[in-house]
Design a protein with these regions (language model features):
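Tandem repeat scaffolds
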Residues: 1-136
Length: 136
């Protein structure tokens, strides 16, 4: 269990917090690339301005967490419960991985351009209309 700790501008790349209980922990301005938070209970924590590329939150419970200006490209949220967490100012949430079991917060806590609907069948995807074929 970790409660009330502050990690400010710390490089925690590839660390493991799997199966841990984190309460009111600040991970602000940190490099959390490839950190393992699988099955963790993460309550009232902040990830403001942190890099979370490839960070694994699979099957975790994040409740009342703040991801303002956090870079979530490649983050994994499969089977995660993200109820009440705030992703509204997060970056690259469209580049994360999730599945039909992921529980997202209400739309007011998500970026306007984010689609939380999981599509396991990609056959319905189409190219954008303004696509132009190159001569090369």
């Amino acid at each position: 269990n970790i409660e009330g700790a502050e990690f400010i501008n710390v490089d925690l790349t590839s660390s493991s917090f799997a199966d841990s209980h984190l309460t009111e922990v600040k991970f602000d301005g940190c490099d959390l690339t490839s950190v393992d938070f699988t099955r963790a209970s993460i309550i009232e924590c902040s990830f403001n301005e942190s890099v979370l590329n490839g960070t694994d939150f699979s099957y975790s419970k994040t409740d009342y967490c703040n991801f303002s200006d956090a870079d979530l490209a490649g983050a994994i949220f499969q089977g995660a419960d993200l109820t009440n967490s705030d992703f509204s100012a997060a970056e690259n949430l469209n580049a994360c991985r999730f599945d039909e079991e992921t529980i997202w917060p209400d739309n007011e806590y998500l970026p306007e351009d984010f689609d939380s609907n999981y599509a396991s069948d990609l056959s319905s995807l189409q190219d954008e209309d303004d696509y132009q074929q190159s001569d090369y």
